[in-house]
Amino acid sequence: MLLSGKSLKHDFIRFVSATMASQVVFSLYSMVDGLMVSIGVNEYAMSAVNLAIPFTNALFSIAVLFAVGSSTLITIFIAQEKRREANALFSQNFATLLTLGAVITALVLLFLEPFAYLLGADEITLDYVKQYILGIAPFSVCYLVSYNLEVLVKTDGYPRYALFTVIGGCLTNCVLDYIAIFHLDMGVFGAAVATGISQLVTCISYFVHFFSKKCTFRLCKFRFDPHLYARILPIGLSDGVTELCTGLMIFLFNRTVLKCIGTDGVVTYTVIAYVTTIVINLMVGISQGSQPLASYHYGKEDHTGCQKLLRYALTTVCIFAPALFLLVFFFAPQIVRTYLSHAGDELIAYSIGAFRRYSVSYLLLGFNIVIGGFMTAIERPVPAICISVGRGLALQSAVLLLLAAIFGGDAVWYTPIFSEALCLVMSLLFLRSYRRQTDMQA
């Protein structure tokens, strides 16, 4: 693992800043698709892209599951100078993702229309959803491999290389989106293909690194060892569940809003979901950027270093959380009008109010994500999974359904505020338990 040798704080800033930037750029993939589809087609096509997001979230969650678990274990192996084991794990994980991607592509294309209905498509959005899935599904392997290699490049000590690769992929997506939608008139299908090709471009860039001499670990012949996943999957489960829960909550929110408010409510939530994805990914960037460092110091049994990294991460959240909330609160009208340029004044006004209420949750969610990610880095999967499932699905879905049933449709916009607050209580309890155990070992 390539460290600067200057200070722990310097390494933290170097890793986290690059990871946060790459996470923001990665979230722009769906935002660019949605924005260009809204302008180039219509707002219902944009809603269809939002309906398809749970599918891409599912792909991303699988990628995160294997990437975080394997990178954590590889980092520990490297800290323990077990280079051969690190190479074998890297190679096995890569082969597994190729197989999973091929299977997912085949199943989705075989059951395309039922899958579109499962995502929440109706008579208005069915064709749009099918077109988007048809364009993105063949690139499932690229989705899985791309993020896995990105995390491993950062684990190898080259976060800037990963950042520039992600930026290059995003720029490719923007250019191809524009060409496909506005020049080739390919609509939603063109937006999906553009996104898939950009993922392929990032994969190729990462391969250049892993076949270079500067790479610490590389592909090699290996004997498949299923027992490795007994360690990989529990470690990566927390972050994987965090990503999967994002997709599941978008799915559940779409269903609930459609039932309680109607189609305009889904359009409103689509705008909120795009911006919230950026906020969440920024916090995930803080978490995942510090994880390789925390795992490295944990492997060396440096508990003081681990606690410093946690303090740095939480301090970063304290800076970014209120800044993001204020930014969204005051610029909500401009953001909403950008996406709903063809909508009526009533829908725009309603969306601005809903957006501002929802954005209060931005003050809390980062703390839960960082604490859960830290538990992952130090091989405490049970607290990490509890936090991830709690904030991402269990508490949020329960609060959503309860508020909708008691107070009606408009109350759903308060859902994340209450669910994140409840989860924060649980996170702080787990954190207190960890600190007590660490103090006893000192």
Range-by-range predicted roles:
Residues 14-33, 135, 146, 169, ...:
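Transmembrane helical elements of multi-pass membrane transporters/channels
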Residues 28-47, 116-123, 179-186, 247-278, ...:
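Helix-terminus/linker motif at the lipid-water interface of multi-pass membrane proteins
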Residues 43-54, 129, 133, 192, ...:
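Small-residue hotspots at the loop-to-helix junctions and early N-terminal turns
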Residues 58-61, 105, 173-177, 203-207, ...:
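Hydrophobic transmembrane alpha-helices of multi-pass small-molecule transporters
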